[in-house]
From Swiss-Prot:
Example GO molecular function: structural constituent of ribosome
Pfam families, alphabetized: Ribosomal_S8
Function, in words: One of the primary rRNA binding proteins, it binds directly to 16S rRNA central domain where it helps coordinate assembly of the platform of the 30S subunit.
Matches recorded under Gene3D superfamilies: 3.30.1370.30, 3.30.1490.10
Record keyword ATP-binding present: no
Alphabetically ordered keywords of this record: Ribonucleoprotein, Ribosomal protein, RNA-binding, rRNA-binding
Protein's UniProt name: Small ribosomal subunit protein uS8
GO cellular component annotations of the record: ribonucleoprotein complex; ribosome
Assembly and oligomerization: Part of the 30S ribosomal subunit. Contacts proteins S5 and S12.
GO biological process: translation
Superkingdom field: Bacteria
SUPFAM superfamilies: Ribosomal protein S8 (SSF56047)
InterPro entries found in the cross-reference section: Ribosomal_uS8 (IPR000630), Ribosomal_uS8_CS (IPR047863), Ribosomal_uS8_sf (IPR035987)
């Protein structure tokens, strides 16, 4: 079956595993999903990213992060730019998620980066999702 929005599927898998307090979640791999996972790792939302070769496109195995009493580190994930309605923002219009407590992931001409990095680089782009 062809997936119409693989990024939304990735975010939904992470959200569901997080709510169920699973240790890991497996996601079909792609370059964009890999870049999003690496940003989540760098920003401290997940513990680790592992690539598994399944003979097809590969699988990303994300280890989710929880606090000392099993409280969730990821409070929420929201897809912003969808296949039916793309959302773009200039560098001076990039959104701040929860006043800077969360991150927006932006697809720019210089690659996929957080809203803070895009503001610093002075580039705008497609607002992929919010994570807080």
């Amino acid at each position: 079956m062809v997936m119409t929005d693989p990024i939304a599927d990735m975010l939904t898998r992470i959200r569901n595993a997080n709510i169920a307090r699973h240790e890991t979640v497996e996601i079909p791999a792609s370059n964009m999903k890999r870049a999003i996972a690496m940003i989540m790792l760098k920003e401290g939302f997940i513990k680790s990213v592992e690539e598994i070769d399944d003979g097809k496109g590969g699988i990303l195995k994300l280890t989710l992060k929880y606090g000392p009493n099993k409280e969730r580190v990821i409070s929420g994930l929201k897809r912003i730019s969808k296949p039916g309605l793309r959302v773009y923002a200039r560098h001076d219009e990039l959104p701040r998620v929860l006043g800077g407590l969360g991150i927006a992931i932006i697809s720019t001409s210089k690659g996929i980066m957080t809203d803070k990095e895009a503001r610093k680089a002075g580039v705008g782009g497609e607002v992929i999702c919010y994570i807080w």
